Amino acid sequence: TDKHRIVFPTKSGFEVIQANSIVYCKSDGSYSNIITIDKEYFTSKSLKEINDIIIDSNFIRIHKSYIVNKNYIKSFKSDEFKLDLITGESIPVSDTLFSKKKLIDTISS
């Protein structure tokens, strides 16, 4: 939902982010990077904690190191098992978590 806000601790305090502005989240050791349309945030929350906070059906844990917002997916490269995002970035998909069919079903639902 558009009103869904998420609060993340940062080095200097905390940030309030609209869930729908998050493109993807990436694990960085025990920390995480939250990438939005216009900014990147660094938080002490783990990817699992972020996954538990984001209770939005538009987000998929596609890899042990990535959570992606379905609204920003442009295409899937099955030869590389990567998703291309509308931001121009490419992120990996775990072939142990997803078959091509399961990925299509998950993205379409």
Stretches found by the model and what they are:
Residues 1-109:
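Basic, polyanion-interacting recognition surfaces, primarily
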